[in-house]
């Protein structure tokens, strides 16, 4: 009808409305009025994302530049928000990498540079804790440096103020006394001494300048920095990034280990 596309059920001859349907090998999304939706994202269950191109076809098993960024979709059309697991470390490391630290949103997004040299391929988003207002994580452009499997991070945190030393796993230096690292532990090398309150505070500001992460995310940065000097950009923005801000599943107060730590 005009420029709008509709589809009639072969069984009932009724117009398909408010659902996705496969037509001639392609999936299309028909809106509430039955009109095919074009050039638009579709969200499902609050997490899965799909994209329908200008012809209304769901993107599957491909990559495509949409707006500023290049996105990857699997065979089922689901947007891939972890290219390390989808494409592998070697593929990711074949590109120059940038770690964007958004202080406003307490969110990190890792980007890979495309053939044009622009960091426009989002690789993974991570929830984090940046420095507090009194001891902020410095803004600016830096790069990853030394890495440490475990490291003494000094004394005092907002969850342990007796001055005792705390420690971090998968520690990556990027500027001055600032590091990416796991949430803190009270015993060096013992991953069952986690400061649970600090873990549950991820997504909010409050560190002494370092950037705290879930163990699995700190490990990713550690592994990348072991093989490439990654660019680090610390900035402020109300835009969480192309993958948004990841949600944190909090742990009970008695749990003394990071649930993302495969060695715990």
Language-model region placement:
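Short strand-connecting beta-turns/loops that link adjacent beta-strands
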Residues: 45-46, 104, 226
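Short polybasic amphipathic segments
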Residues: 7, 106-111, 232-234
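Gly/Pro-biased beta-strand-loop elements
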Residues: 86-194
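Exported/periplasmic cell-wall-interacting domains
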Residues: 151-264
């Amino acid at each position: 009808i005009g420029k709008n596309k509709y589809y009639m059920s072969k069984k009932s001859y009724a117009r398909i409305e408010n659902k996705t349907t496969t037509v001639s090998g392609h999936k299309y999304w028909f809106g509430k009025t039955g009109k095919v939706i074009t050039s638009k994202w579709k969200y499902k269950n609050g997490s899965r994302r799909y994209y329908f191109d200008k012809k209304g076809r769901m993107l599957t098993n491909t990559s495509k530049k949409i707006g500023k960024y290049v996105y990857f979709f699997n065979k089922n059309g689901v947007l891939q928000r972890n290219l390390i697991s989808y494409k592998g470390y070697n593929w990711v490391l074949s590109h120059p990498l940038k770690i964007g630290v958004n202080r406003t949103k307490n969110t990190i997004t890792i980007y890979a540079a495309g053939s044009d040299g622009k960091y426009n391929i989002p690789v993974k988003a991570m929830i984090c804790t940046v420095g507090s207002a009194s001891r902020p994580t410095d803004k600016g452009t830096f790069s990853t440096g030394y890495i440490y499997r475990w490291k003494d991070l000094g004394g005092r945190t907002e969850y342990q103020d007796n001055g005792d030393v705390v420690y971090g796993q998968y520690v990556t230096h990027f500027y001055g006394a600032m590091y990416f690292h796991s949430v803190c532990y009270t015993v060096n090398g013992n991953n069952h001494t986690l400061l649970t309150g600090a873990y549950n505070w991820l997504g909010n500001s409050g560190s002494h300048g370092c950037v705290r992460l879930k163990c699995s995310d700190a490990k990713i940065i550690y592994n990348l920095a072991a093989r490439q000097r990654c660019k680090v950009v610390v900035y402020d923005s109300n835009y969480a990034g192309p993958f948004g801000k990841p949600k944190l599943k909090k742990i009970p107060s008695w749990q003394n280990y990071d649930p993302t730590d495969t060695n715990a």
